[in-house]
Amino acid sequence: MIVKTRAVVLRDIKYRDQSKICLLLTREYGQVSVILKGGRSAKSKTGMLFSPGNLIDAVLYKKGNRDLQLASDASLVKSPLSETPDLERFSVLYRVLDLVRYASGPEEKNVPLFTLVAATIERLCDTERDFQPILAGFLLRLVSVLGFTPALKRCVFSNYDLLGSIEEMQLDELLFVHDPGGFALPGSAVPMGATIQRVPVSHYLFIRALAATGSQAACPEASPEEVSAVTALLQEYCACHLGRMPHRKHLDIVSRLISA
């Protein structure tokens, strides 16, 4: 059947002479692998629309028993690639796309995830500088969408209020705990095998401010060094939990098609 769906292009790969295979994150169907016949031809009107990072309305010939669907048409909604070239924008964009590839699976509808990715791409399109806070916000919301929201209000071990304890004990450091995710007070009884990091209280306050900020609102202010450190922390936390997700069979399918 012919279906129309909004989609984010996660990846494109050359296929044979003039075609290409694309991995899409769609609103209605989750990840879908599609082939765009003649998509690399100079005469193709839609080939360039199926470029990584583009937000598009795609028309597909979809069959339920087929691993590779046929893309027939598309219209552009937003494209970070059409903005003024900026290496930092592209770096953030491709980190987002790479994470989403592993955070979602074929035919697994996840509207909150799609909404987050689409909103992040729109933010990248509408922002002229300071792209790292957008990445930090994306990482924090991604782990929440996937069900790994870190505890930000209370110590994950003692259940004491974190803000109150910081003020009362005049703390300048907290413990970041990867599993269970969240923050803990120094001196807490840490279970054997728990992965923890000592982090400045300023990291905690910035992450808490990010969590309270809507996806379309301006990111809280912080120094570039603070943003970079928090982004690295959240990326490590995200990778820790994504590494436990099941292997996605569509990646094998695409690899076999490329090598055919």
Swiss-Prot record:
Instruction: Supply one GO BP term.
Output: DNA recombination
HAMAP family tied to this protein: RecO
**InterPro entries this protein is in?**
ARFGAP/RecO, DNA_rep/recomb_RecO_N, NA-bd_OB-fold, RecO, RecO_C
Q: Which UniProt keywords apply?
A: DNA damage, DNA recombination, DNA repair
What does the function comment of this entry state? Involved in DNA repair and RecF pathway recombination.
Q: Which gene encodes it?
A: recO
Q: Which organism is it from?
A: Chlorobaculum parvum (strain DSM 263 / NCIMB 8327) (Chlorobium vibrioforme subsp. thiosulfatophilum)
- The keyword DNA repair belongs to this UniProt entry's keyword annotation: yes
Name of protein: DNA repair protein RecO
Family named by the database record: Belongs to the RecO family.
Q: Which GO terms describe its cellular component?
A: bacterial nucleoid
